[in-house]
Amino acid sequence: MSDEVLCAIDGGVATVTLNRPGQRNAMNTALLAALRARFDELDGNRDVRVVVVRGAGPAFCSGMDLKEMEARGGAQGADPESGVIEVLGRVERSRHPTVAVVHGDAIAGGCELALHCDLRVAADVARFGMPLARIGLVVPFVLGQKLLEIIGPAHTRHLLFTGQPIDARRAHEIGMVHQVVPAGELEAATQQLAQSIARNAPLALAGIKATIQRAISLRESIAHADLDEVTGRARRSADASEGRRAMLEKRRPVFRGE
């Protein structure tokens, strides 16, 4: 299987690691396919009780791979959000409880990956952000719903309208993160949490997860085709192209409302 996503199992705890450290674990096509395959594989493993998701290198995940997106046609290319949404949904539907361990930046799709896990533990130096407006993009409806579900309308507005990242302490204050620990204690805190889950009855864990998922799935019944079109128009806009180029070129974008 692809080295883009690694997996190790020990004592009922499966650790899934995004493994593109040189690209800050940006979500390219290969990583998304490997992540989906890992979760498919783990769902059939009866020895697994809990899945820990983490990133190699300095970042948890920096979101979509903008370089690949530009290479595939930029604003006129295939819809990149659909692939991310599909894989995030697969993570959320995992048969096992999932824990995101965020040691560095979790930005855009990386933030959403953490949110699509059941629990989140963060180092005090971690940051979370949804800077889509800063590159001319609109958050897809289903991902916006996940933010609303976890941090509520007021904090969702602030996070999306400003596009500014928040630190781990603030993320904990608004309910985005369950636990914040010093960076040097993150591994021990993760193991303690994972083992506290893993020693519980497997059928009970699966049943609890299924019950929660059924309640969450109600959001999928909301019609949002019109909002998907809004998202698509923004992605295809000149401003979005300018935003992506500016980020890759490490400069301030010049938006024209076009």
Predicted feature descriptions by range:
Residues 1-56, 89:
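Conserved CoA-thioester-binding segment of acyl-CoA-metabolizing enzymes
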Residues 2, 245-258:
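Terminal low-complexity tails and localization/encapsulation signals of metabolic enzymes
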Residues 16, 20, 35, 53, ...:
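Terminal peptide-recognition signature
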Residues 55-93, 106, 136, 219:
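Glycine- (often His-adjacent) and acidic-residue-rich active-site loop
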Residues 89-205, 222, 236-237, 241-242, ...:
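Crotonase-fold acyl-CoA enzyme core
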Residues 159-160, 211, 215, 229-235:
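Helix-loop "lid/cap" segments that line or gate small-molecule binding pockets
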